[in-house]
A protein has these predicted regions:
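Polar-ligand-bearing catalytic/cofactor-coordination segments
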Residues: 1-77, 91, 95-174
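Short, contiguous hydrophobic alpha-helices characteristic of membrane insertion segments
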Residues: 80-91
Length: 174
């Protein structure tokens, strides 16, 4: 939520299927999003990307109309028949911009993971919670590189587990 409506909701499934130390780690991760105002950061990026998308479409769509004139019979963006061409230009711009939003989201999630580890000081619990989430999830633990770069909004679960385990090792030795 925004403003006074900001809340973390704890589901009965979480309470029933996760031990308290893992719930604490999960809530610390979610609290990080509030502490860092991640929703506002993501909204600002999306607005900026919306303007960038509109700019790209304004440049690409006229070129596409000219290029496709022979096949479509569309001479101008003022022709209602150009709507599918504008739609295609919008889709292409979205594909081009998708990795930017995904990379930003992954960076925010990594930051929230680090916050959870620093607040709870319990990488064991966080790694265990992530393993439990992975076991219940249908997400691919080894997504292809292209999927990770273009579409993934979270780092791969195994990378996150490794980070939590590294936190344990680092703090056990230092």
């Amino acid at each position: 939520g925004l403003g006074r409506a900001t809340r973390n909701v704890v589901s009965d499934t979480l309470l029933e299927q996760f031990p308290p130390d893992e719930i604490e780690a999960i809530l610390a991760h979610e609290a990080a999003h509030q502490a860092h105002r991640d929703l506002w950061r993501m909204m600002a990026l999306e607005v900026g990307m919306g303007y960038l998308m509109a700019f790209l479409v304004s440049r690409v769509a006229p070129v596409m109309v000219t290029w496709s004139r022979r096949w479509t019979g569309v001479d101008s963006l003022e022709d209602v028949a150009s709507v599918p061409i504008v739609g295609l230009a919008t889709m292409l711009a979205g594909i081009i911009l998708a990795p930017i939003g995904a990379a930003n989201s992954r960076a925010i999630e990594r930051q929230a993971d680090r916050f959870a580890l620093e607040v709870t000081r319990n990488g064991f619990a966080y790694a265990s919670a992530l393993r439990r989430i992975a076991a219940k999830s249908l997400a691919d633990p080894f997504p292809p590189r292209l999927v990770r770069i273009v579409l993934a909004t979270h780092p791969p679960i195994l990378e996150r587990i490794a980070m939590a385990e590294a936190y344990n090792s680092k703090n056990a030795n230092g």
